[in-house]
């Protein structure tokens, strides 16, 4: 198998009370697992695709045969998006950024509160299923954007630094139709050390 589902880096209940254990278990063990399984099935007969990283797959969809391109776009996107999602959260999350990303957010958006409001607004306004992101754009600046379905910012040449899943499966058991409430609660579980690591890598081009 080319791709594997990594275990969650913390217990299912580690993000309580903001994200419940049942949601985490279903989200990781069922939804994310399905993306990995579907991706592996799609590339089973393409050994060259199996040797690519998931990031390379979504960055270079033009290299993917047309008969499996949409399946790879959806499921490789789901895999790379969720892998980041788990890693940028943690049991000892903090609501306020630390380190270099804090200064960069202030410089780009005026303040953390202004950034948070713009980020939450973008997530609230994403129609249907999708994601909201902070990215290093192709031009090198920080931008907030949202993508539909499981599309990764990598498809458009942007480097994701952090992202929140606004598919209903990410929050519906606890928040039902109250997506803005979920978006606001999510800030309490962020692992800013990991986000800083991704920020440094994005800004240095790695």
UniProtKB/Swiss-Prot annotation:
Coiled coil regions in record: none
On the tree of life, the source organism's domain of life is: Bacteria
Q: What is its EC number?
A: 1.15.1.1
Q: Which cellular component appears as one GO term in the record?
A: cytoplasm
Q: What class of enzyme is it?
A: oxidoreductase
Q: Cell inner membrane: is it a keyword of this entry?
A: no
The stated induction of this gene product is:
By methyl viologen, and under conditions of iron or nitrogen stress.
Question: Per the record, what are the reactions this protein catalyses?
Answer: 2 superoxide + 2 H(+) = H2O2 + O2
The record's SUPFAM superfamilies line, in alphabetical order, gives: Fe,Mn superoxide dismutase (SOD), C-terminal domain, Fe,Mn superoxide dismutase (SOD), N-terminal domain
Q: Which residues bind Mn(2+)?
A: 27, 82, 165, 169
Q: Which Pfam families match?
A: Sod_Fe_C (PF02777), Sod_Fe_N (PF00081)
| Metal-binding listed as a keyword | yes
Its annotated function is as follows: Destroys superoxide anion radicals which are normally produced within the cells and which are toxic to biological systems.
Entry protein name = Superoxide dismutase [Mn] 2
Which gene codes for it?
A: sodA2
